[in-house]
């Protein structure tokens, strides 16, 4: 789908790009995910300012919503992701994949940091909801 952002969406994307610590506080359905993904794409592939992004979200949102949003928008083609959900072996396999974005549910953050055995080497962290 072609992304034709509203002015507020362009403003929000630019705000994220210009501020290393930012919050996008909009009502449901106003495009927080695509705003954030547009900024991530720019930071990963055009500015080369980040190399690895962690998105922390509720289980359903991390498993279903974020992948659907990444796949939905034409301008995000080439954006790679891995869903770090499931059994411990499935989560470890997901972390071994080469991707720009790693999607994880909140309940697994402690495991990721303290028990997974993988370094916490993310350049950017997004906390959803």
Model-derived features with residue positions:
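SF2 helicase/translocase NTPase motor core
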Residues: 1-26, 30-129
């Amino acid at each position: 789908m072609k992304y034709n952002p509203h002015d507020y969406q362009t403003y929000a994307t630019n705000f994220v790009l210009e501020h290393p610590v930012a919050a996008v506080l909009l009502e449901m359905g106003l495009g927080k995910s695509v705003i954030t993904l547009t900024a991530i794409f720019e930071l990963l592939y055009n500015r080369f300012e980040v190399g690895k992004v962690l998105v922390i979200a509720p289980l359903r949102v991390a498993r279903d919503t974020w992948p659907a949003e990444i796949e939905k928008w034409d301008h995000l083609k080439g954006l790679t992701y891995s869903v770090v959900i499931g059994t411990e072996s499935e989560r470890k396999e997901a972390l071994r994949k080469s991707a720009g974005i790693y999607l994880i549910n909140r309940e697994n953050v402690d495991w990721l940091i303290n028990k997974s055995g993988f370094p916490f080497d993310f350049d950017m962290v997004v906390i959803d909801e």
